[in-house]
Amino acid sequence: MSNDRNAQELLKWGLANSGSTGVASFASQSVEQISADIEAGRRPDLADPNLYNAIMGKSEAQMMAEELSVAIDTSRTLPDRMTALDNFEMLIEQIDNANNMTSMKMWSPIISLLSAPEAEIQTAAAWIIGTAVQNNDKAQMAVLDFHPVAALLDLLHSHVDEVRAKAMYALSGLLKHNPAAMHQFDQLDGWNMLNMALVDPNLGLRRKTAFLINALLLQDPNSLDSQPASTSTATAIAPVSFTPPTPTAPPAPLERGPETLRTSIPHPNVARALVQSNIINTLISSLLPAHTLPDTLSPPPTGANGDSDARLDLDFAEKSAAAILTFTTKLPPSPSHPLDPTTISLFKALLVQLQAKPLDSSDPASTRWAELGIHAHDFDQFKHKIHAL
């Protein structure tokens, strides 16, 4: 059955069962006849726009607008606003709805909620941003006009764990393969905030930060020495054909890269930023025994009572080790930007630790590097790099 036929049958059913005076008698009319009567003013009982909503239900765009209206209304109760934000977040999990936020001018009010006085509202707003930009290059670019990076970095100062965690979640989605967002992040010295997050009392935030650092290294085409290069794919290239096209063959579609990679903005040099901000030193120190480090490099303990050793958290240790190994792949044989003696000594101390026994005596691995899930080939490359320093 066609969509038009479905619409006609549905409207007829609604008219027949509406209970309005004189409506049921017109149920046998076509949609075209009824529409003509409405336009001519002969059917005021059907001119109410709420009738369509009653029959068909509200569109998701309407629901988004209504939920956002409640969320930004400071006269409403906090539970009402939180429910509205939760509903809005579920709606924009659908990528088309997330992209509609731009045409519906919803980005500005959502970004403004990041500075709301209520931590719960801040958390929900950051969650919405993170969900909207997740694997969505169009949303990643659209939101940049509203300067979300600065607002999200500010939230990393929050005393509320969940606010900081959701801010990091949103940042991770926003910065993913996005040189324009990375440029904003770099200009705002976001590296300093990442360094602080690596020693956050909340171990969950440390894990998220280490994971993000590794992701930024992996997406960066630069080595430690290279100048930032544009990652633009703005020029569309058609696949090359080695046989003459037949007259009936359709033209080959042009390849179009993600919106985030269609700018001429160069990706910042992540490896160099990690050195200049001391993030690499913080990462390495997090995997070394505290008693072997100077006070300035010893990471604070974690846990509710401040008595937990982050090295014993396998998830955090694995993510930190992965980021460190990725960093070493960026080191050229003879770097023109040599590492300072402190960083070199930390690398050599880490090599010793990774070759030692696992921290968990029940782990079947024979070495710390195997305990952290590092492949033998990758560890050999790491060892070669460190010996060359």
UniProtKB/Swiss-Prot annotation:
SUPFAM superfamilies: ARM repeat (SSF48371). This is Hsp70 nucleotide exchange factor FES1. InterPro entries: ARM-like, ARM-type_fold, Hsp70_NEF-Inhibitors, Nucleotide_exch_fac_Fes1. Its main location: cytoplasm. It is found in: Cytoplasm. It comes from Mycosarcoma maydis (Corn smut fungus). One of its GO terms (molecular function) is adenyl-nucleotide exchange factor activity. Keywords: Cytoplasm, Repeat, Translation regulation. Functions as a nucleotide exchange factor (NEF) for Hsp70 chaperones which accelerates the release of ADP. Required for fully efficient Hsp70-mediated folding of proteins. GO terms for biological process: regulation of translation. Belongs to the FES1 family.
